Amino acid sequence: MSKATYKERAATHPSPVAAKLFNIMHEKQTNLCASLDVRTTKELLELVEALGPKICLLKTHVDILTDFSMEGTVKPLKALSAKYNFLLFEDRKFADIGNTVKLQYSAGVYRIAEWADITNAHGVVGPGIVSGLKQAAEEVTKEPRGLLMLAELSCKGSLATGEYTKGTVDIAKSDKDFVIGFIAQRDMGGRDEGYDWLIMTPGVGLDDKGDALGQQYRTVDDVVSTGSDIIIVGRGLFAKGRDAKVEGERYRKAGWEAYLRRCGQQN
């Protein structure tokens, strides 16, 4: 588990995307990623307007939106990301052969590679998924892109454990510049081999313990103390009538204080 500061890690990271993200985290004093699964662009943009100042990263599932368009959804999202200084992460969870994911990432309705700074993929199909996605990014844009591998999940009964997790970590080692880290519940090591992987952890909640569909929540302190660099919070920010601005600051503060404790800068 890294005890270096985000600023220190930004200065030495081989990935431009990861370095930019670490710098944003340092400058805004936040390690909060907002996961906003809503059905309309209007709802999405309203929540982003409220949460933008508190987050380092926005995680989307644009295939949930009933009215998605590049002009009506992506353009204003990119404007908000510039206004409030956060990156965009499309939680696509690619899981197919290299040529197929290359097309899914670059083409179709969503053209993810054009606008999302970060996306993610399962390791189930092997290292070809990394090379396919990287090729797509290089062909579509000159902007740097980053990939997260799904090493562990937060849902009850997940099969992403043990040898599967180990195999996914091995796949991540195939490309130090493009693969920037993992969706995981804990530190994934690698520093002794020269890797500085970002760990992003979903299933973080200060109030709820889970839901009826198998989601299991862990506290902010728990995930950060076991190696998470970025806490991913969804319904805890806006569901059940919650005030997104209030909850955004609450989670930002909790995440930042947990990070300072991990780095030895706060008791």
UniProtKB/Swiss-Prot annotation:
InterPro entries: Aldolase_TIM, OMPdecase, OMPdecase_AS, OMPdeCOase_dom, RibuloseP-bd_barrel
Lineage top rank: taxon: Eukaryota
Record's keyword terms, sorted: Acetylation, Decarboxylase, Isopeptide bond, Lyase, Pyrimidine biosynthesis, Ubl conjugation
Coiled coil segments of this chain: none
Residue numbers of N-acetylserine PTMs: 2
Species the sequence originates in: Saccharomyces cerevisiae (strain ATCC 204508 / S288c)
Intrachain S-S bonds: none
Protein name: Orotidine 5'-phosphate decarboxylase
A cellular component annotation (GO) from this entry: cytosol
Pathway linked to the protein: Pyrimidine metabolism; UMP biosynthesis via de novo pathway; UMP from orotate: step 2/2
Binding residue positions for substrate: 37, 59-61, 91-100, 217, 235
Active-site residue numbers: 93
Molecular function per GO: orotidine-5'-phosphate decarboxylase activity
Record-stated family: Belongs to the OMP decarboxylase family.
Effect annotated for changing residue 160 to S: In strain: +D4
Presence of keyword Acetylation: yes
EC number: 4.1.1.23
Reaction catalysis annotation: orotidine 5'-phosphate + H(+) = UMP + CO2
Covalent link Glycyl lysine isopeptide (Lys-Gly) (interchain with G-Cter in ubiquitin), residues: 93, 209, 253
Claim: Lyase is one of the keywords in the record: yes
SUPFAM superfamilies named among the record's database cross-references: Ribulose-phoshate binding barrel
GO terms, biological process: 'de novo' pyrimidine nucleobase biosynthetic process; 'de novo' UMP biosynthetic process; UMP biosynthetic process
